[in-house]
C-alpha cells in the first residue's frame, strides 16, 4: 500500500508516468484487506496499545517484545521523567525524553481520543507533578504504551505496533481522494472512509 502511494505521489510530483495507476493499485489492495472482514478498529483508541489487549484485530503488523535488553519495547523509558514513580508499584526507568508539545496537545479537541494516551500530570513518589513547568515544560507525556508489569524496568513486553487497520482505511481514503476527489468513486467515498477513523 505505502509503496503504491509513494510511487503515485512521486510520479504526480515529477510529472512522469500515469500516477493514477499507482493510486488505483493502492485503493484496490486496501479494499481487498477491508473485504477480508478480519481486521477492525478497536472501540477504545487507548486499548490498541494496552498490554492486556495485545494481538487485537486492529493490529496488522507488530514487533513482538520481551522484557530484556535489545528485545524489549523501551518507548515508555524514553517518555517517562526521571522522577516518575508508578502508582501500581512497577519499577520503571525514565529518561525524560519524548514529549508531545503543548501547542500540539492543545490543538486536539477536548473530546479527541488522542488525549486519552497523554498524561498531563504524574506521580513522583511524593506528590502529583502538574502544570506546564519543570519536567512538563515542553509537553504532555505521550503514553500510548502504558505501564506493563512484564518489564525489567526499561524494556517491557508490549508489542511495538507498526501497522494498523486504521492505516489501511486512511490510505484507501487518500487513494480514493487522489483518483475521484473527496466525494466521488462510489461508496465508501474518501470522506466516508476518513470519518470511520
Model-assigned labels for residue ranges:
Residues 174, 191-194:
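Generic hydrophobic alpha-helical scaffold/packing signal
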Residues 6-15, 178-182:
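Short coil/turn linking the two alpha-helices of tandem helical-hairpin repeats
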Residues 28-35, 39-179:
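Elongated scaffold/linker segments in the mid-to-C-terminal portions of large proteins
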Amino acid at each position: 500500500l505505502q509503496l503504491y502511494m509513494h510511487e503515485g505521489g512521486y510520479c504526480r510530483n515529477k510529472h512522469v508516468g500515469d500516477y493514477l495507476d499507482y493510486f488505483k493499485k493502492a485503493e484496490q489492495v486496501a479494499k481487498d484487506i477491508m473485504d477480508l472482514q478480519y481486521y477492525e478498529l478497536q472501540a477504545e483508541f487507548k486499548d490498541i496499545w494496552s498490554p492486556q489487549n495485545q494481538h487485537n484485530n486492529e493490529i496488522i503488523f507488530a514487533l513482538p517484545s520481551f522484557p530484556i535488553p535489545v528485545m524489549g519495547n523501551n518507548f515508555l523509558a524514553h517518555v517517562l521523567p526521571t522522577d516518575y514513580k508508578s502508582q501500581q508499584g512497577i519499577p520503571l526507568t525514565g529518561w525524560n525524553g519524548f514529549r508531545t508539545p503543548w501547542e500540539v496537545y492543545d490543538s486536539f479537541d477536548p473530546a479527541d481520543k488522542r488525549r486519552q494516551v497523554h498524561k498531563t500530570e504524574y506521580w513522583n513518589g511524593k506528590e502529583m507533578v502538574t502544570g506546564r513547568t519543570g519536567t512538563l515544560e515542553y509537553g504532555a507525556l505521550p503514553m500510548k504504551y502504558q505501564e506493563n508489569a512484564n518489564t525489567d524496568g526499561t524494556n517491557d513486553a508490549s508489542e511495538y505496533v507498526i501497522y494498523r487497520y486504521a492505516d489501511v482505511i486512511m490510505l484507501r481514503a487518500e487513494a480514493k481522494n487522489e483518483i475521484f476527489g473527496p466525494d466521488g468513486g462510489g461508496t465508501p467515498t474518501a470522506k466516508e472512509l476518513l470519518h470511520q477513523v
